[in-house]
């Protein structure tokens, strides 16, 4: 089947925001207006088209990234609706990796919120052009100008309105387009019924001023516009649109639009902005990959180049089995074709190719550069793997995912559950790179680890619903880490004589802190003092010892180990001896390099009425929290603080009690930090390890 939409007429976009800003409702309305669905569902009623998992419909939140495709102004728009809850940021991250542009939805009353900052950071990391949609303009307390100020203040970005709302809160009735200087008025909630009206007289001067501010903001991106404006000539609609688009594509300018998705006001204007300003696959830089020899290779959005795609999501579908979502960067591929998983060096077969609409699907014969689709039949492919033409060895940059910060033990209720649980956990871990499972060697318990309590709740619930596994779950535990804080040289010898051939391994290793860079091993052996064949054993010995910890059994992270000297024995030296010597060196570093325990620190935001600020701050301080800021949020105060995760269990109940249920809070993992000495001693004592 030939390509239906040219690359120029294709948009791959994500919709992202803080929880409850209205992402899923916005996507629903987009699908409604583009004719993809004929009846809209409401998230809070559990009827949303995009929230298709049972847990999503019950909880009224989006957990996985549902993908769908629609058409607007003869353009094909592939949309991914992403979760706003902090426990599911991995879904946002892997979606942004394969998108060309995004719509960031913010609440007109709240402005930029903590999760907005998180997803914005992720989008910036992947250099994704964005437009900003200020939603809920009909909400009590809605303030369009203040919402834009929060973009400047909290994100530090260049953002200007390209629209001006007519009215606010219950009086929100229309929009002035600052690019074309035209106005529309909305009537009725069921459909976006509009009529063109003259710009209201009381807003005319403000609209002219805001258009001039917009022109000044984007003039640097277009020389012709700059000259036209400086010479006092009228800036045409085409010229202004071109300059805005250039700024957006450079990821240096972010146009802001307004509306109320729930009331069907402004959604068509959002779609227009997507077409006018967000990139097609032709507008983004070619994707960079490397061959197995490390040679850089670029792939362009071109059907005639070799097939190259990135798998960005794996999920189990109750009807077709394992589904692998992928983005095609170059070339084309037919269903039934064989491809190479270059990441794993294995051949795979595209059994069927599906175009997804939330959890319904349409089978297609062929996909082309710029397409997002799902494949059935891939056996070994996981998130972040590259798929390419057979005999090609290009590997695209993969994705980095945060380590879990919270864990619980799960115990199957029956022998039958025991047999099924391992298989269920393996499938769930394959779908979600931030979900880890392992067996505690001391207790024999199965441990599951994730990004938060809700994350683990959902996974345990899925285990019950989808895999029919009943399990008891223990209280959540914090996932601590260990590290070294002082550089030190450590010498270790492993010598064993017991008749016949003995064991001999001798190493001298410099250990030093390596903040934020994980484990790094450097080989500086010269003159053959340790034979080359034993050096990998030293590295392996260290890596195995890191997992078991040196203080309290938690994984050791962020250290650099430089092997610089040692010796060997012609007969007794072996791989095992050097592995043991290396692990002895790491254990010895516990005291000499000042080992410490690290704990996850959460970025917490509490929004509370003024009357309870003192109670909230007192409670945060008592939890070892460090206050960062306070700022007004309508009739309330927003308090930001960094608080150890271990102190946040049960916080929701405490906050309800301290504020008579009138405050809300969100938290997300921010960084690891050293545990105070007294608490470190308690943890070590509790773990029964020295």
UniProtKB/Swiss-Prot annotation:
HAMAP family: EF_G_EF_2_B. CDD domains: EF-G (cd01886), EFG_III (cd16262), EFG_mtEFG1_IV (cd01434), EFG_mtEFG_C (cd03713), EFG_mtEFG_II (cd04088). Residues 8-282 form the tr-type G domain. GO terms for molecular function: GTP binding; GTPase activity; translation elongation factor activity. Catalyzes the GTP-dependent ribosomal translocation step during translation elongation. During this step, the ribosome changes from the pre-translocational (PRE) to the post-translocational (POST) state as the newly formed A-site-bound peptidyl-tRNA and P-site-bound deacylated tRNA move to the P and E sites, respectively. Catalyzes the coordinated movement of the two tRNA molecules, the mRNA and conformational changes in the ribosome. PANTHER family: RIBOSOME-RELEASING FACTOR 2, MITOCHONDRIAL, TRANSLATION ELONGATION FACTOR G-RELATED. GO terms for biological process: ribosome disassembly. This is Elongation factor G. Belongs to the TRAFAC class translation factor GTPase superfamily. Classic translation factor GTPase family. EF-G/EF-2 subfamily. The keyword Protein biosynthesis applies. GO terms for cellular component: cytoplasm. Signal peptide: none annotated. Coiled coil: none annotated.
């Amino acid at each position: 089947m030939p390509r239906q939409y040219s690359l120029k007429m294709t948009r791959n976009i994500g919709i992202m925001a803080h929880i409850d800003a209205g992402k899923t409702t916005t996507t629903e309305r987009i699908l409604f207006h583009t004719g993809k669905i004929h009846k809209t569902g409401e998230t809070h009623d559990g009827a949303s088209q995009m929230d298709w998992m049972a847990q999503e419909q019950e909880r009224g939140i989006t957990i996985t990234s549902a993908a769908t495709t629609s058409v607007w102004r003869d353009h094909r728009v592939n949309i991914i609706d992403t979760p706003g809850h902090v426990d599911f940021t991995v879904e946002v991250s892997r979606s942004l990796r394969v998108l060309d542009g995004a719509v960031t939805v913010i609440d007109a009353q709240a402005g930029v919120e903590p999760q907005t900052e998180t997803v914005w950071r992720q989008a910036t990391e992947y250099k994704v052009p964005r437009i900003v949609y200020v939603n809920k303009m009909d909400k009590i307390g809605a303030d369009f100008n203040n919402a834009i100020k929060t973009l400047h203040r909290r994100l530090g970005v260049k953002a200007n309105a390209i629209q001006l709302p007519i009215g606010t809160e219950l009086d929100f009735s229309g929009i002035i387009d600052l690019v074309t200087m035209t106005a529309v008025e909305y009537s009725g909630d069921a459909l976006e019924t509009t009529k063109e009206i003259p710009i209201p007289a009381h807003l005319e001067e403000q609209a002219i001023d805001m258009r001039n501010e917009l022109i000044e903001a984007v003039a640097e991106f277009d020389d012709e516009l700059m000259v036209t404006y400086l010479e006092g000539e009228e800036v045409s609609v085409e010229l202004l649109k071109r300059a805005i688009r250039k700024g957006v594509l450079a990821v240096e300018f972010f146009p802001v639009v307004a509306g109320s998705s729930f009331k069907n006001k402004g959604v068509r204007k959002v779609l227009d902005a997507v077409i006018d300003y967000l990139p097609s696959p032709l507008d983004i830089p070619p994707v960079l990959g490397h061959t197995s020899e490390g040679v850089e290779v670029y792939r362009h959005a071109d059907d005639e180049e070799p097939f190259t795609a990135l798998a960005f999501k794996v999920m189990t579908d109750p009807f077709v089995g394992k589904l692998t979502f992928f983005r095609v960067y170059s070339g084309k591929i037919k269903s039934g074709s064989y491809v190479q998983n270059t990441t794993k060096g294995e051949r795979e077969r595209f059994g069927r190719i599906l175009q997804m609409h939330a959890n319904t699907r349409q089978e297609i014969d062929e996909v082309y550069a710029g397409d997002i689709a799902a494949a059935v039949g891939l056996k070994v492919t996981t998130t972040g793997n590259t798929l390419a033409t057979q005999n090609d060895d290009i590997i695209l940059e993969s994705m980095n995912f945060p380590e879990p910060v919270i864990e619980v033990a799960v115990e199957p209720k029956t022998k039958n559950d025991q047999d099924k649980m391992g298989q269920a956990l393996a499938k769930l871990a394959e779908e979600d790179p931030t979900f880890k499972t392992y067996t505690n060697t001391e207790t024999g318990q199965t441990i599951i680890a994730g990004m938060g309590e809700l994350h683990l709740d959902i996974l345990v619930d899925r285990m019950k619903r989808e895999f029919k596994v009943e399990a008891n779950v223990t209280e959540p535990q914090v996932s601590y880490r260990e590290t070294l804080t002082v550089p030190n040289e450590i010498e270790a010898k492993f010598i064993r004589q017991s008749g016949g051939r003995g064991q001999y391994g001798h190493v001298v290793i410099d250990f030093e802190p390596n903040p934020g860079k994980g484990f790094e091993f450097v080989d500086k052996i010269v003159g053959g003092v340790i034979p080359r064949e034993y050096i990998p054993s030293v590295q392996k010995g260290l890596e195995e010892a890191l997992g078991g910890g040196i203080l309290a059994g938690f994984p050791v992270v962020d250290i650099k180990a430089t092997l610089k000297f040692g010796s060997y024995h012609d007969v007794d030296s072996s791989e095992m001896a050097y592995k043991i010597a290396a692990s002895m060196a790491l254990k010895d570093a516990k005291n000499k390099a000042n080992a410490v325990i690290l704990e996850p620190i959460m970025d917490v935001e509490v929004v509370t009425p003024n009357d309870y600020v003192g109670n909230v701050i007192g409670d945060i301080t008592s939890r070892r929290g460090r206050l960062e800021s306070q700022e007004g949020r309508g009739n309330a105060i927003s308090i930001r603080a960094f608080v150890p995760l271990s102190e946040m269990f049960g916080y929701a109940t405490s906050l309800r009690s301290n504020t008579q249920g009138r405050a809300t809070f969100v938290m997300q993992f921010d960084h690891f930090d050293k545990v105070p000495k007294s608490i470190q001693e308690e943890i070590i004592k509790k773990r029964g390890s020295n």
